[in-house]
Amino acid sequence: MPLRALVAVIVTTAVMLVPRAWAQTAWERYKARFMMPDARIIDTANGNVSHTEGQGFAMLLAVANNDRPAFDKLWQWTDSTLRDKSNGLFYWRYNPVAPDPIADKNNATDGDTLIAWALLRAQKQWQDKRYATASDAITASLLKYTVVTFAGRQVMLPGVKGFNRNDHLNLNPSYFIFPAWRAFAERTHLTAWRTLQSDGQALLGQMGWGKSHLPSDWVALRADGKMLPAKEWPPRMSFDAIRIPLYISWVDPHSALLAPWKAWMQSYPRLQTPAWINVSTNEVAPWNMAGGLLAVRDLTLGEPLERRRLTTRMIITPPASSCWSGWRNRISASAVMALQVSQPVCLRAERKEQERLTM
């Protein structure tokens, strides 16, 4: 199963408690730049393709900014265009100029999870039970089609197809969206969601290689419970895995799971922290963290909000070389939104939108 080329757009802001006026201004700029009239969120450096992750992040932002008209348009386009009626989940990628805009009929569970979480938050924000009903249907499909027990652990596969290799599973630990899983557990009272949280955290505690003791973007879980970087991808902690401390921090900013991340990040001056590290060879990226990556670093280390504000900006990074030697524009036009203490904490985290394995 080939790994296709990777391209995307960097969109960054600081992680911080933002004044509502600032947040609304940023949201309007985000919509103007990345939201099409039909509410499709575009990856402007990748032929204006769209992904369920981008739709889900934008839906979360719409809720956080109390923008119900935008939310409804986002949800309507996503539901009507990307829904896989065979399983209730969503086709992960849409290419507007392809003969078949949805050539890959697989899903991506991070996108599905974000969409369901946004719908659940919308119900709380606007007291419309239809949103919660839609969220419940998606989470039920996630449990039915993507959650499996393997090596004594309950895990969520990255997609319905292509990740169960019989003697091992290929997992993406950045798809372990703990704050969403916690919300689903509180909503449904199903033990499966709490087991996913506890088993996911237990697995993360055992993922770590090289001098950094950090996980790679993609991890192979063997039937005997042992784990190693998945052979189909470069063994790097990079633009996928950087979201792991983000999701951990949203659930528990004092979690022991953050210890290796803090140790590695603190081993470099702030502006000289490498953008990625090869956890097998200890090779680091020839460029440093900026924008959203720095925002995740600052959040993980508990840096003062004043420092985070200094990184608040929009950045477009030009392509460097081939994807295998490292492109600097592997970042999606997506945005991550969390709400803590009933106030918006906003990060447009720079990351790559990895073209996924297909059968």
From Swiss-Prot:
Pfam families: Glyco_hydro_8. Keywords: Carbohydrate metabolism, Cellulose degradation, Glycosidase, Hydrolase, Polysaccharide degradation, Signal. GO terms for molecular function: cellulase activity. InterPro entries: 6-hairpin_glycosidase_sf (IPR008928), 6hp_glycosidase-like_sf (IPR012341), Glyco_hydro_8 (IPR002037), Glyco_hydro_8_CS (IPR019834). Transmembrane segments: none annotated. Residues 1-23 form the signal peptide. Its EC number is 3.2.1.4. The active site is at E53 (proton donor), D110 (nucleophile). One of its GO terms (biological process) is cellulose catabolic process. It catalyses: Endohydrolysis of (1->4)-beta-D-glucosidic linkages in cellulose, lichenin and cereal beta-D-glucans. Disulfide bonds: none annotated. The biological conversion of cellulose to glucose generally requires three types of hydrolytic enzymes: (1) Endoglucanases which cut internal beta-1,4-glucosidic bonds; (2) Exocellobiohydrolases that cut the disaccharide cellobiose from the non-reducing end of the cellulose polymer chain; (3) Beta-1,4-glucosidases which hydrolyze the cellobiose and other short cello-oligosaccharides to glucose. Belongs to the glycosyl hydrolase 8 (cellulase D) family. This is Endoglucanase.
